[in-house]
């Protein structure tokens, strides 16, 4: 079992198509009796992908491993956090990451990911406020224009 977790940046570096095809072929070859390590390797390759559908499948496979393989839960927590972070599911990413940090408060990779999640949530929250403010200003301008035109008639 892997004890050292990758940093979040590694999730942003997709495998090349031939590498992902090797993992998929192994996964497909094992069929219904797919091994946990094979499934995990394929799931991680999918999470690293730039394709949203691949990332979603990777998260589903990791969720399956988490449910059926207690010995892999530590790893799965982190990889599920990374996968959900890449998908923009920041609440889920934080939930999985916090479960890992509860068990391992000194885990540098999980701490780093927590900072990335918090930064992304803060940035998107500010963007949301800016968008709502812009919509409010636009509505005010349109309302004032309509009111002004109504008074002229």
Curated annotation (Swiss-Prot):
Location(s) in or outside the cell: Mitochondrion outer membrane
Transmembrane regions: 126-146
Ranges of the Mitochondrial intermembrane topological domain: 147-153
Record's keyword terms, sorted: Membrane, Mitochondrion, Mitochondrion outer membrane, Repeat, TPR repeat, Transmembrane, Transmembrane helix
Record CDD domains: Fis1
Topology, Cytoplasmic side: 1-125
Top-rank taxon, per record: Eukaryota
GO biological process per UniProt: autophagy of mitochondrion; mitochondrial fission; peroxisome fission
GO cellular component terms, A-Z: mitochondrial outer membrane; peroxisomal membrane
InterPro entries linked: Fis1, Fis1_cytosol, Fis1_TPR_C, Fis1_TPR_N, TPR-like_helical_dom_sf
TPR repeats, residue ranges: 74-107
Pfam families, per database record: Fis1_TPR_C, Fis1_TPR_N
Gene3D superfamilies named in the record: Tetratricopeptide repeat domain
Topological relation to the membrane, as annotated: Single-pass membrane protein
Biological role stated in the UniProt entry: Has a role in mitochondrial fission. Has a role in outer membrane fission but not matrix separation.
Family in the record: Belongs to the FIS1 family.
Entry domain remark: The C-terminus is required for mitochondrial localization, while the N-terminus is necessary for mitochondrial fission.
Protein name as catalogued: Mitochondrial fission 1 protein
């Amino acid at each position: 079992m892997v004890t050292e977790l990758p940093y979040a940046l590694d999730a942003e570096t997709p495998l090349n198509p031939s590498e992902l095809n090797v993992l998929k072929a192994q996964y497909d070859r094992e069929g219904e009796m797919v091994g946990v390590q094979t499934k995990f390797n394929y799931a991680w390759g999918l999470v690293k992908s730039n394709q949203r559908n691949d990332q979603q499948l990777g998260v589903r496979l990791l969720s399956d491993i988490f449910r059926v393989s207690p010995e892999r839960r530590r790893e799965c927590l982190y990889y599920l956090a990374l996968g959900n972070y890449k998908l923009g599911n920041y609440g889920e990413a934080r939930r999985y990451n916090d479960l890992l940090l509860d068990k391992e408060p000194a885990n540098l990779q999980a701490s780093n990911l927590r900072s990335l999640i918090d930064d992304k949530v803060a940035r998107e929250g500010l963007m949301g406020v800016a968008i709502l403010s812009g919509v409010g200003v636009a509505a005010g301008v349109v309302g004032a224009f309509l009111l002004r035109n109504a008074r002229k008639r």
